[in-house]
């Protein structure tokens, strides 16, 4: 992650041994502690170091932060590290490039040290009809609808202690993509309660698919069943299950957004049957790019594989042809 790179962590270091902030991945600071336009640098950029109360950089400047700081009795925030209360950055400085597609290109165009072009989403965008029309990366990926230039919602930028800030333009920060999480749900999405409750190594030992922490499992534990040391306490297993319930809700929310961006990015025309007789069946379907912002698929060179799952059934519902099908794990 950019944080890990700034901390000097080795590329080959296990995530289990990285700094906790590095393991969080792409968080607020990766974009909002940048004060320089790097252009295409393959993500090799320097973050402005500082604690929680240090200034951040954004498109709007300090008006919103100042309004909160001017009402300490209402928002109960503090800007000193040692002062008790809700800590907040003491200033938001204007950084206009963060609104541009070039800012996204700092990371989303990757050339390896040997010159191999690993990812070129930004280069594709620069040559696209969307770029010619002035549509930015942010317009499609931070607007109302995932993957479409759909305008922006309005509302409070933050809710501090149940008190909303002033209404303003809202940019969506979910950044959905086609990625499918395969990490243990106790580890991802990042959850502060989960991180404080158990280490990553311990979470990897929690067999949530077997039902640990549910009444169905706990009331019928087989004789001689052995738990790893971190999970020998039934209370810990139930507490872990409560955390995972929150995680599964977040994963389901992310899934809906992921499918939204995929459905807007890929369009399937109607199936055209070229032949259907005793000699066989032949058909075709056109897959189209639903966006004019970049290629589909885009992303990393090694991941640019797309196939269709095709199932043909007879009149009785029996499967007579199957292609591109997945196993029980969805692979």
Residue ranges of each PLM-predicted region?
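Primarily the internal scaffold of c-type cytochrome electron-transfer domains
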Residues: 9-331
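Conserved, well-structured interaction surfaces
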Residues: 2-10
């Amino acid at each position: 992650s950019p944080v890990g790179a700034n901390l000097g962590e080795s590329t080959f270091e296990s995530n289990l041994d990285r700094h906790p902030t590095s393991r969080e991945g792409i968080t607020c600071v990766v974009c909002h502690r940048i004060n320089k336009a790097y252009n295409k640098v393959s993500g090799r950029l320097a973050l402005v170091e500082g604690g929680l109360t240090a200034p951040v950089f954004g498109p709007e400047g300090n008006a919103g932060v100042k309004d909160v700081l001017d009402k300490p009795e209402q928002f109960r925030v503090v800007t000193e590290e040692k002062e008790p209360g809700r800590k907040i950055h003491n200033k938001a400085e204007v950084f206009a490039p963060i609104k541009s597609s070039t800012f996204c290109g700092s990371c989303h165009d990757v050339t390896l040290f040997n010159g191999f072009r690993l990812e070129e989403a930004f280069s594709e965008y620069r040559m696209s009809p969307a770029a010619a029309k002035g549509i930015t990366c942010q317009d499609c990926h931070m607007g109302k609808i995932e993957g479409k230039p759909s305008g922006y919602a309005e509302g409070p930028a933050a809710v501090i202690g149940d008190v909303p800030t002033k209404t303003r333009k809202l940019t969506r920060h979910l950044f959905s993509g086609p990625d499918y999480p395969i990490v243990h749900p106790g580890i991802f999405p990042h959850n502060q309660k989960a991180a404080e409750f158990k280490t990553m190594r311990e979470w990897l030992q929690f067999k949530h698919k077997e039902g640990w922490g549910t009444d169905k499992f706990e009331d019928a534990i087989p004789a001689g069943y052995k738990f790893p040391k971190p999970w020998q306490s039934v209370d810990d297993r139930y507490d872990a299950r409560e955390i995972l319930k929150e995680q599964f809700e977040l994963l389901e929310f992310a899934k809906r957004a992921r499918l939204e961006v995929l459905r807007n990015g890929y369009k399937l025309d109607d199936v055209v049957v070229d032949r259907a007789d005793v000699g066989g069946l032949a058909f075709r379907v056109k897959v189209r790019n639903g966006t004019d912002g970049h290629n589909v698929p885009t992303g990393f060179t090694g991941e640019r594989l797309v196939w269709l799952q095709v199932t043909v059934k007879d009149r009785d519902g029996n499967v007579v042809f199957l292609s591109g099908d997945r196993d029980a794990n969805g692979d």
